[in-house]
């Protein structure tokens, strides 16, 4: 695994001058910034993977860090110019660490929402998606109510890849209504026009709704910013087949993530 990650490192940093000058998706920082961020994250991943071989008693924590940092690598590479196959590989190579980091005492909702949303956007295989379904089902059964609420938004996304007779219906409310009720409203829209309106309304408020997130305003801090991408909004749009043409240039909406099939080079 270390080799695979370093292979990614070599492929990016060994790229030609012409490739270095290609435009990137993010509009707030340049390629050099993201290369620095990538180096920082890959170094962290390799460090914690090495710890995993020698310090088993902290396995849970190390697995969680590797899983989280790998999602950040996907974010960084998408902010640059990463394509479907590369991002899929990073996702699937890190999925086992995310699963091994299961902790019913301290679940982190945003990490789980990002992992599920990206699983949908990156078209991961059904057997891997079922691992996410089982993970959240287990969390719903084992986590203490004070720490965790079976969540309507997570299950809307998870159910989108399940057959009708497999869909779960036990979630009754949103775990984070302030942040998520606008997005859940999209899923309940009466028709495609209402869904698009609700989607546009929500993406317009998305950044400010996340002002308590650790990444908020991270572009103002040194070597912290990996991109502002609303993966969960794009995942809902994809599941619902919403015409998102008007959002193509929205700075928070990862349009390419929803439209890999239309990219002939992928």
Tell me what each language-model feature is:
Residues 191-266:
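Alpha-helical oligomerization segments
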Residues 16-219, 225:
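Eukaryote-skewed repeat-based solenoidal scaffolds used as protein-protein interaction platforms
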Residues 1-6:
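Short, Lys/Arg-enriched N-terminal segments with co-localized hydrophobic residues
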Residues 7-15:
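Short, aromatic- and cysteine-enriched interfacial helices/patches
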């Amino acid at each position: 695994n270390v080799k695979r990650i370093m292979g990614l490192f070599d492929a990016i940093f060994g790229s030609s001058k012409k490739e270095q000058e290609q435009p990137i998706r993010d509009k707030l920082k340049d390629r050099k910034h993201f290369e620095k961020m990538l180096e920082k994250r890959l170094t962290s991943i390799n460090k914690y993977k090495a710890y995993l071989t020698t310090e088993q008693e902290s396995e849970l924590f190390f697995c969680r860090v590797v899983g989280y940092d790998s999602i950040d690598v996907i974010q960084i590479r998408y902010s640059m110019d990463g394509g479907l196959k590369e991002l899929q590989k990073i996702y699937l190579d890190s999925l086992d660490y995310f699963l091994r980091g299961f902790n019913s005492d301290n679940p982190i909702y945003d990490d789980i929402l990002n992992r599920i949303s990206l699983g949908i956007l990156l078209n991961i295989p059904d057997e891997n998606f079922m691992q996410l379904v089982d993970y959240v089902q287990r969390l719903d059964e084992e986590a203490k109510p004070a720490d965790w609420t079976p969540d309507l938004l997570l299950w809307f996304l998870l159910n989108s890849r399940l057959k009708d007779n497999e869909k779960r219906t036990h979630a009754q409310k949103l775990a984070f209504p302030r942040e998520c009720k606008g997005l859940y409203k999209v899923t309940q829209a009466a028709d495609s026009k209402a869904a698009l309106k609700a989607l546009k309304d929500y993406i317009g408020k998305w950044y400010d709704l996340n002002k308590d997130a650790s990444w908020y305003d991270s572009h103002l801090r040194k070597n912290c910013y990996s991109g502002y991408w609303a993966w969960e909004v794009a995942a809902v749009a994809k599941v619902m087949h919403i015409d998102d043409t008007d959002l193509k240039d929205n700075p928070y909406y990862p349009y390419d993530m929803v439209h890999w099939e239309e990219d002939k080079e992928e």
